[in-house]
Amino acid sequence: MSNVENKVIAITGASSGIGEATAKLLAKHGAKVVLGARRTEKLEKIVAEIHSSGGQAEFKAVDVTSRQDVKAFIDFAVEKFGRIDVIYNNAGIMPLSRINDLKIDEWENMINVNIHGVLNGIAAGLPIMEAQGSGQFINTASIAAHAVFPTAAVYCATKYAVWAISEGLRQESNNIRVTTISPGVVETELGSDISQESGKDALKAFRKVSLQPDAIAQAVLYAVSQPDYVDINEVIVRPTASPV
């Protein structure tokens, strides 16, 4: 994976699940990874593990709903390593509920994290990448960007937005690669903030067939490792036995 070695890769939502697995895998292949999330105690442990394995990693607290926070995170990556090659906008939440539960605060929070979080990452990194003449955005969408499920209407809408933003940016870019990663059901902390029983029941049903985070990390590695003239636009990764 020679096209991964020495690349500077910033990852949001890196304190667990897909973000953690991806950071460890990319570092194993020689990338310089910068981990961002709110839970810095978890980030510190992950970075220590990467260092103990001979990898290069840094971390910084970031709230992806804050444009200033995300800019500071990307600027930190550039300060530490001199450039930014890949921004993986991975942070997301999924408080499932039926629409008539009217969990309006949860809707707004989901929109802020899942949509604005991606836009903030793009806003922070795009001018730097354009000045460099190269770069790559990887954005976590979901199979929920391609199908709608009961209790997941708003979540699906946010993930379709991620897909649409990614596709629009791809069409507008000549030398910036854009990749959408659309996971199926993965065994992570996603959904731990569900407050409604209907949403909890739906998640249990979904997770009867699920992947481990490393399966998605492998997809990210594949997208990053391609030659610079090759843009993997979207990778959908489902369990083999997935019914959706």
Regions found by a protein language model. Give the residues of each.
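Active-site helix of classical SDR
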Residues: 122, 158
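Conserved glycine-rich Rossmann-like NAD(P)H-binding loop of the short-chain dehydrogenase/reductase
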Residues: 29-46
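C-terminal helical subdomain
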Residues: 180-183, 199-243
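The beta1-alpha1 cofactor-binding region of Rossmann-like NAD(H)/NADP(H)-dependent oxidoreductases
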Residues: 40-41, 61-72, 104
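Conserved glycine-rich cofactor-binding loop
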Residues: 15-16
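Substrate-binding pocket helix/loop in short-chain dehydrogenase/reductase
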Residues: 98-99, 106-108
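Residue(s) in the substrate-gating loop at a strand-loop-helix junction
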Residues: 142
